[in-house]
Curated annotation (Swiss-Prot):
Modified positions (Threonine amide) in chain numbering: 72
Organism: Conus striatus
Comment field on protein domains: The presence of a 'disulfide through disulfide knot' structurally defines this protein as a knottin. The cysteine framework is VI/VII (C-C-CC-C-C).
Function: Omega-conotoxins act at presynaptic membranes, they bind and block voltage-gated calcium channels (Cav). In vivo, this toxin is a potent paralytic toxic in lower vertebrate species, but it is much less effective in mammals.
Cysteines paired by S-S bonds: 49-63, 56-66, 62-71
Residue stretches of biased makeup (Basic residues): 28-40
Pfam annotation, one family: Conotoxin
Subcellular localization(s) per the UniProt record: Secreted
Annotated keywords: Amidation, Calcium channel impairing toxin, Disulfide bond, Hydroxylation, Ion channel impairing toxin, Knottin, Neurotoxin, Presynaptic neurotoxin, Secreted, Signal, Toxin, Voltage-gated calcium channel impairing toxin
Family: Belongs to the conotoxin O1 superfamily.
GO molecular function, one term: toxin activity
Listed name of the protein: Omega-conotoxin SVIA
Distribution of this protein across tissues and organs: Expressed by the venom duct.
Superkingdom of origin: Eukaryota
Length: 72
């Protein structure tokens, strides 16, 4: 019986501590700039645009626009 009460109290305390720390950290990120630059560099490396004069189509993206199969 004592062990059960101790376990219940311990679980309640741990739950309360998690809820308190979750409310305190809402809306804050420690390393916001690291995450945003990592995400940006990853997306830039997969979607680079092609320069003027290079061939373009459905799978390639031009920096300007695609006109008659060539980037302008």
């Amino acid at each position: 019986m004592k062990l059960t009460c101790v376990m219940i109290v311990a679980v309640l305390l741990l739950t309360a501590c998690q809820l308190i720390t979750a409310e305190d950290s809402r809306g804050t990120q420690k390393h916001r700039t690291l995450r945003s630059t990592a995400r940006r560099s990853k997306s830039e490396s997969t979607t680079r645009c092609r320069s003027s004069g290079s061939p373009c189509g459905v799978t390639s993206i031009c920096c300007g626009r695609c006109y008659r199969g060539k980037c302008t």
